Regions:
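N-terminal pre-domain segments of enzymes
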Residues: 30-124, 219, 223-271, 522-524
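N-terminal cap/lid segment of alpha/beta-hydrolase-fold proteins
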Residues: 102-103, 107-111, 122-184, 191
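Cap/lid segment of the alpha/beta-hydrolase catalytic domain
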Residues: 186-346, 383-393
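Mobile cap/lid helix-loop segments that gate and shape the active-site cleft of serine hydrolases
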Residues: 309-313, 320, 336, 376-433, ...
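Alpha/beta-hydrolase fold nucleophile elbow
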Residues: 346-358
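Glycine-rich nucleophile elbow surrounding the catalytic serine of serine-hydrolase chemistry
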Residues: 356-368
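C-terminal catalytic histidine-bearing segment of alpha/beta-hydrolase fold enzymes
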Residues: 409, 457, 464, 468-530
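Conserved strand-to-loop "acid loop" that flanks and positions the catalytic carboxylate
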Residues: 438-461, 508-510
């Protein structure tokens, strides 16, 4: 039994292990007696080690995302966007047989697709994952707008008895209406921290210290340059917001820059200059919201792959080629959050949605695909490695994600498709990731995009490639008795398709932000509340 006194002592030790420095955290690692400490490698060293294991001598460079005069500038010409127009058929087994029954999808084809994503794209979650013990460390009564709310701050302590050198403490907050008459649906967002008391959005880069091996989260999860400091991508308001530049330059060995200039930043999301925050929009429906800190699960960089949950499971050693990357680790953390929600009487655990923007949009669709308890998902500007088709030559491409700034998101095997192999050699594509979510509702989103929309647009994430992935998942939705978007032609900007279906898409008229489409996602979700 944990007493108030012991909780206080735990909190003081927890806070004392870290020192906040300009939005990041200095971590003091204490090596267990008799245990080998985690291997220390830079991301360049780690990626080179993986390339050597795969027999890869060099990788193709990623595209530049900002400078239109760069000879390696990203392609935004639709006539050059589809070098590999034939996608893998989600309803054809590897033996060539067509899938015509739902049972064949569940028992045969879906497992084939999962295996390909596990081995080649996102990596495998280790067997015998440790237990996570959730503890409410703070409860606050307050207001968000004009709604009385209760906010719980939690730590999910991962059992590290197999390797005490590494501690993982998952940071989660959940806010519910104080006057709710029963359990409420919860929209969980990747990318926050504990949040501010009373449920208000925390300021960018603010928050309490993280666990002893946890790291400063990429709060907005935005682009910035590959290798940019965590926090590039969303504004405190989250609507169009004030433009703000990302970190300058890619590190040596990295890809070209991703577009950050003009993108909105921060943790809040969901409003323009004066409108309600996304959290207030959720509360207006009588629902709750949650914030899951990915940095408390696994660092968003390749320098720390021997730490975090990945390092814990590998006992501080480097990854194997099919080991999981950060996206799959963050998705695992979302599943553990659902474990907690199933014990919280204020939460309707059958209606947990997940939302993520940019890199966290990638994590959100991965979480939805792998976690059957997830109700619905809002995938915002996820780009390459998320809902965008891998085979599309538009904006961010496989080579960008294989750079030292981003490779840690994926399995090591993913590097092959930026080196000796081509995009077309991938056994799967992102329409099949969306199909893994079927028949549950999926909302796909991106901002304006095209050569003339830069540098203040969302071209990098390929709105059309995301839409086409949704189209490609449609046959699986129909097979399972669900409704696809009902269209195959890319819709006009600000035209929602799939409004009354199980798959929906909308391209808004702003830049790299999730703000404008929050109201549409919430209306979409409400139609699927059963």
């Amino acid at each position: 039994m944990v007493t108030k006194s012991s909780r206080w002592q735990m909190g003081m030790v927890f806070a004392g292990l870290l020192c906040a420095v300009e939005g990041s955290f200095v971590i003091r690692t204490v090596t267990a007696a008799g245990g080998a400490p985690p291997v220390k490698m830079t991301k360049e060293e780690d990626r080179k080690k993986m390339m050597d294991a795969l027999g890869i001598e060099s990788l193709r460079p990623g595209k530049a995302g900002r400078d239109k005069t760069d000879p390696n500038f990203a392609n935004y010409d639709e006539s050059k966007a589809n070098p590999y127009p034939k996608l893998p058929d989600p309803l054809t087994l590897k033996n060539g047989k067509k899938v015509t029954k739902a049972s064949e999808w569940w028992n045969k084809r879906r497992p084939e697709i999962v295996e390909d994503f596990d081995r080649e794209v996102y990596g495998r979650v280790p067997k015998n994952m440790p237990k996570v013990k959730w503890e409410v460390v703070n409860t606050t009564n307050g207001k968000n707008g004009d709604v009385d709310v209760v906010t719980k701050q939690l730590l999910g302590v991962v059992d590290n008895s197999s390797y005490p050198d590494i501690e993982v403490k998952i940071q989660l907050s959940v806010t519910t209406p104080a006057n709710a008459k029963g359990p409420v649906p919860v929209i969980m967002q990747f990318g926050g921290g504990f949040g501010a008391p009373g449920g208000a959005a925390a300021a960018p880069n603010a928050g309490p210290p993280y666990g002893p091996n946890a790291f400063s989260p990429a709060r907005g999860g935005g682009f910035g340059a590959p290798g940019a400091a965590a926090g590039a991508g969303r504004g405190a308001a989250g609507g169009p917001g004030a433009p703000r530049a990302g970190a300058a330059g890619a590190p040596a060995g990295g890809a070209g820059r991703g577009p950050a200039a003009g993108a909105a930043f921060g943790a809040g999301g969901g409003r323009g200059p004066q409108g309600p925050t996304w959290q207030q929009q959720v509360l207006a429906k009588g629902w709750g919201y949650a914030s899951l800190n990915p940095g408390s699960i696994q660092a968003d960089n390749g320098d720390n792959l021997t730490l975090g949950i990945i390092g814990l499971m590998n006992k501080g050693q480097p990854r194997k080629p099919d080991d999981w990357g950060s996206l799959r680790a963050w998705a695992w953390g979302a599943s553990r959050a659902i474990d907690y929600f199933e014990t919280d009487k204020a939460v309707d655990a059958k209606h947990i949605a997940i939302e993520g923007h940019s890199r966290y949009g990638k994590a959100a669709v991965v979480a939805m695909a792998y976690e059957p308890r997830m109700w619905t998902v809002y995938v915002s500007s996820s780009g390459e490695g998320g809902a965008k088709l891998h085979r599309r030559n538009w904006g961010e491409i496989i080579e960008n994600v294989a750079a030292t700034s981003e490779y840690h998101w994926m399995a090591g095997n993913f590097l092959k498709y930026a080196g000796p192999k081509t995009w077309d050699d991938l056994p799967v594509d992102s329409h099949e990731l969306i199909a893994m979510c079927a028949p549950r509702p999926v909302y796909l989103s991106a901002g304006k995009g095209g050569y003339d929309d830069e540098p203040n647009g969302d071209s990098w994430v390929d709105a059309k490639g995301t839409f086409l992935a949704g189209v490609g998942a449609g046959p699986v939705y129909r097979l399972l008795g669900a409704k696809d978007m009902g269209v195959t032609e890319f819709p006009a900007r600000e035209t929602e398709v799939g409004t009354n279906a199980d798959l929906a898409f909308r391209q808004h008229a702003s830049g790299h932000t999730d703000g404008p489409n929050w109201p549409f996602f919430l209306e979409f979700s409400a139609k699927h509340l059963k």
